[in-house]
Regions:
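A short, hydrophobic beta-strand/beta-hairpin element that forms part of a small beta-sheet core
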Residues: 50-59
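ATP/adenylate-binding site constellation spanning eukaryotic-like Ser/Thr protein kinases
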Residues: 7, 47, 65
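Thioredoxin-like thiol-disulfide oxidoreductase module
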Residues: 31-47
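C-terminal cap of thioredoxin/glutaredoxin-like
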Residues: 58-71
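Conserved helix-turn-beta segment immediately C-terminal to the redox Cys motif
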Residues: 17-36
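Local sequence-structure signature of Cys/Sec-based thiol-disulfide redox active-site neighborhoods
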Residues: 1-23
Length: 72
C-alpha cells in the first residue's frame, strides 16, 4: 500500500494524489496538519516538506511522475 503524507493547501500533494487516482493506484492519505503525530516519522526518514510518498522501503518527497511510476 502506498501512503501519501500531505499538508493542507499543498499543491504538490494534490498533484500526487490526482496522478495516482487517474491511474487507479490505491493509496492511504495521512494529513500531517490533522495527524501531527506522524511528523516525527517523516523527520526520521529525512524529510521536512510534503508530500512524502512511501511504499515499503521506497520513500521520496515531492511530486515526481518518474518516481511515482516506480510504485506501479
Amino acid at each position: 500500500m502506498v501512503t501519501i503524507y500531505t499538508k493542507n493547501n499543498c499543491r504538490q500533494c494534490m498533484m500526487a494524489k490526482k496522478w495516482m487516482e487517474h491511474r487507479g493506484i490505491e493509496f492511504e492519505v495521512i494529513n500531517l496538519d490533522e495527524s501531527p503525530e506522524y511528523v516525527e516519522h517523516i523527520q526520521e526518514l529525512g524529510f521536512k516538506a510534503a508530500p512524502v510518498i512511501e511504499k515499503g522501503d521506497f520513500v521520496f518527497s515531492g511530486f515526481s511522475p518518474d518516481k511515482l511510476r516506480q510504485l506501479v
